[in-house]
Amino acid sequence: MALILTFMAPACASANETSVNWFMKGYTLYYEEKFSDSLDAYNKALELNPKDSEAWNNKGIDQGLLGKYDDALSSFETAVALNDSYAEAWFNMGVIYDIKGDYPTAVQAYKRATEVDPSYHKAFVARNVDTDLLMGRSLSCACQDQLALV
């Protein structure tokens, strides 16, 4: 039994390193603005480690930048299903709902981001902007003061 465990552990570590390597490749390609290639790398990372909430979030970012908004939402939803306290994924979900013009749902996503991380100023500002839009008002003074934080 010990012999089997000895052989299994290195195999698991190797698969994990490969997942991390694909993740880092996706990250690098994203910063080179090669979003399609970055998306491919995140897909490969997720084949090896489908429970990586960061890879799901980053995949969603690439999908959003490529105009695949429904796919992006699905990726962000998977990220928060794996890690409900992932404020950035909640924020990114709100951004996509904003792009789609679904401000009430965007407000809920931003609200969740600020519940998870009260210091997440971008989500706080975006929530206030959308709330003002929904209420048919111009930006409130409090919200205008926060815009510098974005």
Q: Where are these predicted regions, by residue range?
A:
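Structural signature of tandem alpha-helical TPR/SEL1-like repeats
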Residues: 31-44, 65-78, 100-112, 134-143
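C-terminal segment of classical bacterial N-terminal signal peptides
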Residues: 5-12
